[in-house]
């Protein structure tokens, strides 16, 4: 039986040899490996350091070819030998343990010109009658490139046919080492090597040894792992397939297999996609060309190589915010503070939980953030922090959210204490001027605030920090410090200016501001003996010193000091001489005399809780207009009800409905009685105010009309004086009564 198999091998080798000589190429050969038909693990071809792709066809394993005088584009079937499988007989009928692993093959950088040749392999088995089972031994294939090949173990291997082509020799060997006393065969190794001089086969493992001593470094290796299974059916076995998983050898394998790393497989995993490119149905009404283009870009240029998760899972997978890929696929993860700092413990894992709660965007409760002058947190969320100590400071006490307004209360109380209420207000006094600069408080209040400074910093120290004191490298601030200070200053001065009050005695003409109401030549109230309150100041009574009542009416008041001299005023601020214009403050006097509140509110106690004891003129007009509009609408509704109402009938149901309608109507009248009285009262007040101010308004309009003529005459007199001075310099004398022609021709208005 063994002789018959050797004969069949020789015939098949001679046929293959003849075909290879006829074709003139070391072209593609078909590796015919008998194996199981189903149920076993397919062979794997391992590639290290190179591309792995499913390149196996239905015909076998196409190897790289070296074309000599042939057309590369021709069909590959012409270069494949016709292996006769009819002479094969099934020898083993039981299973055999598969080959666990082979030592990795080494491929040197010799004179191998991408030409390899594979011959038909057949199994050479020795029938052992002493074993109950005849295992099929694993085959060993050694593809060598060189000028000659040596065999050292088995002298019968030299008798095997060889197929030389283009100076290359290919050796196909089979080893069968059954021992009569052994129960299991010993598999031989498989190695693919290239050398400049040749190769030698030693023992059960064929190793490549350079004869010239010029073996290059290992560049790539190709390993063919073919598990041996019993074959009961004559024919081709499963085709080897490319597999990206590394295969390691057994106990006595070489060290090259152990040097296989996982990153090599991952390196090529991003190049070879595991799915087909997107090909949507373009005839479908749901086809979106933009979506197809985006999918094609994602398929061609993947940003995250490796296994891709679905979008609904990928958006919830935590990622490293520092080592995140920067690309167009950052919709799921972003390096912005709004998305990466949601969990502060991920960014600062070594921080204690108490400090982690002080991070920006960690939650609504941020007890230890530094405050800008306006109370805005220093960081609105950002990674560019100077140090971790800047994020945390001394924790504030509970209820410290309103600490800013609590800091303002001492200043407000101090201003309330020092402002004079029962005596004339001196707008030009040294105390007021000093208060404008530094806002000092009386001595008791200063001592009180000094005692409070030990347990709570003052509002000025907490809100007035310069830009140099704030240590921060973040360029994105909520508001610039300068603008914040200006806004704080405006609000602070506005709260102080509202404390200027007018007592209730002002209604009776006993104002502490002592407004002059004498008759005489009058002009615009713009002299140096007058002062103008800020536009936001409110004229209020002494009953409400703490409430804020914005006044839109500019009140011109005249304040006299103890010496009877005028102080701060608009004309003095402009540098205009006080004797140039003569004024009479009749308008401010009359405006200050009219009552802004209801007459019944004069004798009441001071109100608290922010209620307004006195109302300004503008607020009174607004209130009157709103109430009048409401009253008119209600009267229209009442007219509609009364017009559509019907008289009561004699039956009981009609009487009940009429009685119910009467009760509702009476109740509605009672509810709107107060509205009616308020409209009447405020209307009378406004009418009285208009009547009192009618002559004042007429006087003001007449003065405005006369001002143009007065200014023109003053300009003419100034021009005459200039001409007189020029004439005196020139030595000419003019008649004193003579006036310039321009002044004579110009009409005099208002004289």
Curated annotation (Swiss-Prot):
Residues 176-200, 520-537 have a biased composition (Low complexity). GO terms for cellular component: centrosome; cytoplasm. Keywords: Cytoplasm, Cytoskeleton, Phosphoprotein, Ubl conjugation. Interacts with CNTLN; the interaction recruits CEP68 to the centrosome. Interacts with the SCF(FBXW11) complex which contains SKP1, CUL1 and FBXW11; the interaction is probably mediated by FBXW11 and the complex also contains CDK5RAP2 and PCNT. Also interacts with F-box protein BTRC. Interacts with serine/threonine-protein kinase PLK1; the interaction leads to phosphorylation of CEP68 and its subsequent degradation. Interacts with NEK2; the interaction leads to phosphorylation of CEP68. It comes from Pongo abelii (Sumatran orangutan). Residues 1-17, 86-96, 399-416, 433-450 have a biased composition (Basic and acidic residues). Residues 131-144, 163-175, 339-348, 451-461 have a biased composition (Polar residues). It is found in: Cytoplasm, Cytoskeleton, Microtubule organizing center, Centrosome. This is Centrosomal protein of 68 kDa. It comes from the Eukaryota. Phosphorylation by PLK1 is required for binding to BTRC in prometaphase. Phosphorylated directly or indirectly by NEK2. NEK2-mediated phosphorylation promotes CEP68 dissociation from the centrosome and its degradation at the onset of mitosis. Involved in maintenance of centrosome cohesion, probably as part of a linker structure which prevents centrosome splitting. Required for localization of CDK5RAP2 to the centrosome during interphase. Contributes to CROCC/rootletin filament formation. The modification Phosphoserine is found at residues 326, 466, 472. Residues 1-253, 339-474, 511-545, 590-611 are annotated as: Disordered. GO terms for biological process: centrosome cycle. The keyword Ubl conjugation applies.
């Amino acid at each position: 039986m063994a002789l018959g198999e050797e004969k069949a091998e020789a015939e098949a080798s001679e046929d293959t040899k003849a075909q290879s000589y006829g074709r003139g190429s070391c072209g593609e050969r078909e590796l015919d490996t008998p194996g199981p038909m189903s149920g076993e693990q397919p062979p794997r071809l391992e590639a290290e350091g190179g591309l792995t792709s499913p390149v196996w066809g239905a015909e076998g394993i196409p190897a790289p070819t070296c074309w000599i005088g042939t057309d590369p584009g021709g069909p590959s079937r012409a270069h494949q030998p016709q292996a006769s499988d009819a002479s094969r007989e099934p020898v083993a009928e039981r299973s055999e343990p598969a080959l666990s692993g082979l030592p990795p093959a080494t491929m040197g950088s010799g004179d191998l010109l991408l030409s390899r040749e594979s011959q038909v392999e057949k199994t050479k088995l020795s029938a052992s009658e002493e074993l109950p089972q005849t295992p099929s031994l694993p085959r060993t294939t050694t593809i060598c490139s060189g000028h000659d090949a040596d065999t050292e173990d088995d002298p019968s291997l030299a008798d095997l046919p060889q197929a030389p082509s283009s100076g290359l020799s290919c050796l196909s060997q089979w080893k069968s080492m059954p021992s009569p006393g052994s129960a299991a065969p010993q598999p031989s190794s498989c190695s693919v090597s290239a050398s400049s001089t040749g190769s030698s086969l030693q023992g059960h493992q064929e190793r490549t040894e350079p004869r010239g001593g010029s073996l290059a470094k290992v560049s790539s290796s190709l390993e063919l792992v073919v598990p041996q299974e019993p074959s009961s059916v004559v024919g081709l076995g499963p085709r080897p397939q490319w597999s990206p998983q590394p295969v390691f050898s057994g106990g006595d394998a070489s060290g090259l297999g152990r040097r296989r790393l996982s990153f090599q497989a991952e390196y090529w995993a991003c190049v070879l996609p595991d799915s087909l490119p997107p090909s949507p149905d373009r005839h479908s009404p749901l086809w979106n060309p933009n979506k197809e283009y985006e999918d094609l870009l994602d398929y061609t240029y993947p940003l995250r190589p490796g296994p891709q998760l679905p979008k609904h899972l990928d958006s919830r997978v935590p990622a490293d915010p520092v080592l995140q890929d920067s690309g167009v696929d950052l919709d799921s993860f972003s390096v912005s503070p709004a998305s990466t700092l949601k969990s502060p413990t991920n960014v600062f894992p070594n921080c204690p939980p108490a400090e982690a709660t002080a991070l920006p965007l960690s939650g609504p409760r941020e007890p230890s953030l530094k405050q800008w002058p306006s109370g805005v947190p220093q960081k609105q969320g950002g990674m560019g922090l100077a140090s971790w100590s800047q994020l945390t400071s001394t924790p504030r006490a509970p209820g410290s959210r309103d600490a800013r307004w609590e800091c303002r209360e001492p200043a407000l109380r101090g201003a309330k204490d020092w402002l004079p209420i029962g005596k004339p207000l001196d707008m030009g006094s040294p105390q007021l001027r000093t208060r404008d600069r530094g806002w000092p408080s009386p001595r008791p209040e200063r001592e009180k605030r000094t005692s409070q400074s030990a347990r709570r910093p003052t509002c000025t120290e907490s809100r007035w920090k310069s830009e140099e004191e704030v240590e921060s490298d973040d360029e994105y601030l909520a508001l610039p410090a300068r603008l914040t200070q200006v806004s704080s200053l405006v609000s602070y001065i506005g709260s102080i200016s509202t404390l200027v009050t007018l007592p209730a005695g002002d209604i009776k003409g006993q104002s502490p501001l002592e407004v002059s109401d004498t008759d005489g030549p009058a002009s615009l109230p713009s002299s140096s003996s007058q002062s103008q309150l800020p536009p936001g100041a409110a004229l209020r009574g002494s009953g409400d010193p703490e409430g804020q009542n914005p006044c839109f009416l500019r009140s011109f008041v005249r304040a006299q000091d103890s010496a009877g001299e005028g102080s701060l005023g608009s004309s003095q601020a402009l540098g205009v001489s006080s004797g140039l214009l003569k004024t009479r403050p009749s308008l401010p006097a009359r405006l200050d005399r009219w009552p802004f509140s209801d007459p019944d509110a004069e004798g009441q106690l001071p109100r608290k809780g922010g209620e307004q004891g006195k109302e300004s003129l503008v607020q009174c007009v607004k209130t009157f207009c709103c109430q009048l509009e409401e009253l008119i609408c209600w009267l229209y509704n009442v007219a509609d009800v009364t017009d559509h109402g019907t008289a009561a009938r004699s039956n009981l149901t009609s009487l009940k409905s009429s009685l119910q309608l009467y009760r509702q109507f009476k109740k509605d009248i009672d509810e709107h009685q107060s509205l009616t009285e308020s409209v009447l009262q405020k209307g009378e007040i406004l009418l009285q105010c208009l009547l009192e101010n009618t002559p004042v308004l007429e006087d003001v309009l007449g003065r405005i009309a006369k001002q143009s003529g007065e200014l023109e005459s003053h300009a003419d007199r100034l021009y005459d004086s200039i001409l007189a001075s020029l004439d005196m310099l020139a030595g000419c004398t003019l008649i004193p009564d003579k006036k310039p022609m321009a002044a004579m021709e110009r009409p005099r208005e208002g004289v």
